[in-house]
């Protein structure tokens, strides 16, 4: 079974380049040719952005028979949301607040994850997200895919969630599979 992944709300430079109105700054944006984490993420304070995500996920649900859809949720800097009037208005509307552990912007991402979980459930699908979705309030039925080690997976299970263990140091096949890099250069 192929489980599709549409990484959101970060890792969206291609979408922002094509649809700059989906971002907090309005662009212009440019697709990167190299790996990286961009401060430019989707503006989740705009209802039009949320509708875009639902439209994309609806199409993904039609294309893939898997009961799961992976929404990513990793590596989403909050710096644009901190200054974005749309995101700040949504934070106020939802009554989100900073606490001792996370910022209101982290809880804004929790809102996005929960909303996407509800949407996917309406299509008969279940949500998977990278272990960053544990930062704040986890969507009630989310499966957590732990890539930054084993701690996230263990935390998810303790919280009653299913977990998929994929710690990058062991399961990323583009990493060296041996400490002997002279004789094992396949990475």
Region roles according to the model:
Residues 106, 142-143:
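A generic secondary-structure micro-motif detector
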Residues 1-123:
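Substrate-binding cleft of carbohydrate-active enzyme catalytic domains
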Residues 22, 42, 53, 71, ...:
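Generic structural hydrophobic/aromatic packing signal, biased to beta-strands
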Residues 124, 129, 134-140, 147-187:
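Conserved alpha/beta catalytic core and glycan-binding cleft of carbohydrate-active enzymes
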Residues 3-9, 70-74, 128-130, 145-147, ...:
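A cross-family glycoside hydrolase active-site/sugar-binding cleft signature
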Residues 20-23, 88, 145-147, 181-184:
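Short, hinge-like loop/turn segments at secondary-structure boundaries
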């Amino acid at each position: 079974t192929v489980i599709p992944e549409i990484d959101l709300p970060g890792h969206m430079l291609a979408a922002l380049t094509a649809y700059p109105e989906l971002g907090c700054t309005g662009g212009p944006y440019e697709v990167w040719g190299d790996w990286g984490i961009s401060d430019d993420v989707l503006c989740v304070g705009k209802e039009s952005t949320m509708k875009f995500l639902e439209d994309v996920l609806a199409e993904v649900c039609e294309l893939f028979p898997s009961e799961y859809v992976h929404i990513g949720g990793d590596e989403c800097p909050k710096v644009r949301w901190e200054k974005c009037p749309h995101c700040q208005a949504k934070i106020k509307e939802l009554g989100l607040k900073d606490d001792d552990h996370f910022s209101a912007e982290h809880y804004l991402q929790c809102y996005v994850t929960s909303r996407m979980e509800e949407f996917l459930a309406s299509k008969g699908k279940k949500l998977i997200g990278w272990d960053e979705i544990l930062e704040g309030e986890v969507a009630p039925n989310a499966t957590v895919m732990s890539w930054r080690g084993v701690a996230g997976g263990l935390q998810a299970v303790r919280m009653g969630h299913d977990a998929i263990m994929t710690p990058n140091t062991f399961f990323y096949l583009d990493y060296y599979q041996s400490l002997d890099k002279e004789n094992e250069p396949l990475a």
